[in-house]
């Protein structure tokens, strides 16, 4: 009886729910169509490659060889062209210095369509902040990258590198090529943990380290989410196994960072512990963050501390891994430059047992080779912005506020109008006389303008120490049967790893 009475009500309720859901879907679709129309109208003056009716350029971008496909598009469509991920997300893809300057000399925010996926892990740190809050954090963090702070890190870079090289001695004795990318990643994270938290893993045994596994997992899962349209919706993503795995990894990473912050704050309250911290041979990144204040005397909150630490770990780990790995690949590919770098490093080290801060500035040829490697294999091949005001480019074409910009660094660095013979490895491009007249936005491995990479000096110093010690211990050569296949993810990776042969050198230097 009761069921019979309720049945019409339940039916009506189900009908209304269906109508509401349908209306929401229609409104969402209408909103997306309006956005599509607005974006298409904004980019109407920019011709580009043909698009798929549903996926836009996404299918082309996800294929192997997509980086060189974009370079070919850049030759066909000078300055810039539209780039569509599906039918509702469209960027103006730029790869010309004057176009890059028009956008990157300003302080426009990062594109939310891409970088909002990072928020669950790294929070609102320097990478994703904009406006006055970004300026405040940038100012507070800048002292953490002063050369007086960076000087003691040279010994930390060397310590972690030598542990990796000892591991490579054993692998090299097998007379087989092996993938260096994973080991370089372990070393880079060990270094970063020492510089950030004041502690690392003395044996590089990160496979059993939950924090290391979480950071590695989060990086790969974020890339997977960006590449998969069905994962762009938060509600859908958190219901999937990958979404739940992402949340678990986030919790592990956050719990670790929160606990380290809590312990460090407690130590600073204890006078004896505070003196120990002050007497250490170096201050780590967390020490500096805990001490900074703005003009009003306000410190970073715990949430802000965690966001900046997590941002530093995210930005400083994979990018350095990519840069070092591709540099060693270039050294194997061009043995004549490898030998010149090695001779320079030997001359600088002399009778010393290890490198000093002042030695880094003397590595001129190694630095030129490193920059040429960054040109051909930029660690971050593509970055994104969202215009907060209109922009007019040098050729008179313009975009309105709200438009999305993709700076394709890989294509910019292979732009033949800027770089003659762009596929040729020529370190002398970066000699003082050749670099003097170059456009300031022609070479952007660390971005450029007011929102450039705050940690670029830290990264350059680390890569110099690591690569110099590598060249002192080993001669690197290619495995022709396992040449790397470039894959553009959050960083530039190789689909099949970077496999090299290593031949130990009879020298005590670098040990």
Swiss-Prot record:
It is found in: Endoplasmic reticulum membrane; Microsome membrane. Its EC number is 1.14.14.1. Heme binds at residues 315, 453. InterPro entries: Cyt_P450, Cyt_P450_CS, Cyt_P450_E_grp-I, Cyt_P450_sf, Cytochrome_P450_Monoox. One of its GO terms (biological process) is biphenyl metabolic process. It comes from the Eukaryota. Disulfide bonds: none annotated. Keywords: Endoplasmic reticulum, Heme, Iron, Membrane, Metal-binding, Microsome, Monooxygenase, Oxidoreductase. Its cofactor is heme. Its main location: endoplasmic reticulum. Gene3D superfamilies: Cytochrome P450. The keyword Repeat does not apply. It catalyses: an organic molecule + reduced [NADPH--hemoprotein reductase] + O2 = an alcohol + oxidized [NADPH--hemoprotein reductase] + H2O + H(+). Induction: P450 can be induced to high levels in liver and other tissues by various foreign compounds, including drugs, pesticides, and carcinogens. It is an enzyme of class 1 (oxidoreductase). It holds the Pfam family p450. It is a peripheral membrane protein. One of its GO terms (cellular component) is endoplasmic reticulum membrane. Cytochromes P450 are a group of heme-thiolate monooxygenases. In liver microsomes, this enzyme is involved in an NADPH-dependent electron transport pathway. It oxidizes a variety of structurally unrelated compounds, including steroids, fatty acids, and xenobiotics. Belongs to the cytochrome P450 family. This is Cytochrome P450 4B1. It comes from Rattus norvegicus (Rat). The gene is Cyp4b1.
């Amino acid at each position: 009886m009761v069921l019979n009475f309720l049945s019409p009500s339940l039916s009506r309720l189900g009908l209304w729910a269906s109508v509401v859901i349908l209306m929401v879907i229609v409104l969402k679709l209408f909103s997306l169509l309006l956005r599509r129309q607005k974006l298409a109208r904004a980019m109407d003056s920019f011709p580009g490659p043909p698009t798929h009716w549903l996926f836009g350029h996404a299918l082309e971008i996800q294929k192997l060889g997509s980086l060189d496909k974009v370079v070919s598009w850049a030759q066909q469509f000078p300055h810039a062209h539209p780039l569509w991920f599906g039918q509702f997300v469209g960027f103006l893809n730029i790869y010309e210095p004057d176009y890059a300057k028009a956008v990157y000399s300003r302080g426009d925010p990062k594109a939310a369509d891409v970088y909002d996926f990072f928020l669950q892990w790294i929070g609102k740190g320097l990478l994703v902040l904009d406006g006055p809050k970004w300026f405040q954090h940038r100012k507070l963090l800048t002292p953490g990258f002063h050369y007086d702070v960076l000087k003691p890190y040279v010994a930390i870079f060397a310590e972690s590198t030598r542990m990796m090289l000892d591991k490579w001695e054993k692998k090299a004795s097998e007379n087989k090529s092996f993938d260096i990318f994973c080991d370089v990643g372990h070393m880079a994270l060990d270094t970063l943990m020492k510089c950030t938290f004041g502690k690392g893993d003395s044996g590089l045994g990160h496979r059993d380290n939950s924090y290391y596994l979480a950071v590695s997992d989060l990086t790969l899962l974020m890339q997977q989410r960006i590449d998969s349209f069905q994962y762009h919706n938060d509600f859908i993503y958190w219901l999937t196994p990958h979404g739940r795995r992402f949340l678990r990894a986030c919790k592990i990473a956050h719990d670790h960072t929160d606990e380290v912050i809590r312990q460090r704050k407690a130590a600073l309250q204890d006078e004896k512990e505070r003196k120990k911290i002050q007497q250490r041979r170096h201050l780590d990144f967390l020490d500096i963050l805990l001490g900074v204040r703005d003009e009003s005397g306000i410190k970073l909150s715990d949430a802000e501390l965690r966001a900046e630490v997590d941002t530093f770990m995210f930005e400083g780990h994979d990018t350095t891994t990519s840069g070092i790995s591709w540099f060693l690949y270039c050294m194997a590919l061009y043995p004549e430059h490898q030998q010149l770098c090695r001779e320079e490093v030997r001359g600088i080290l002399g009778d010393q047992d290890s490198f000093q801060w002042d030695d880094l500035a003397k590595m001129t040829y190694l630095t030129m080779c490193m920059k040429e490697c960054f040109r051909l294999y930029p660690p971050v091949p593509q970055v994104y912005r969202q215009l907060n005001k209109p922009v007019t480019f040098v050729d008179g074409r313009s975009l309105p506020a709200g438009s999305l910009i993709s700076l394709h660094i890989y294509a910019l660095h292979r732009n033949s109008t800027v770089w003659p013979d762009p596929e040729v490895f020529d370190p002398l491009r970066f000699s003082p006389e050749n670099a003097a007249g170059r456009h300031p936005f022609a070479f952007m491995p660390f971005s450029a303008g007011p929102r450039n990479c705050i940690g670029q000096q830290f990264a350059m110093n680390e890569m110099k120490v690591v690569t110099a010690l590598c060249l002192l211990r080993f001669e690197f050569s290619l495995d022709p049967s396992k040449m790397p296949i470039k894959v553009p993810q959050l960083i530039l990776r190789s689909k099949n790893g970077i496999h090299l042969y290593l031949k130990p050198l009879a020298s005590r230097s670098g040990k």
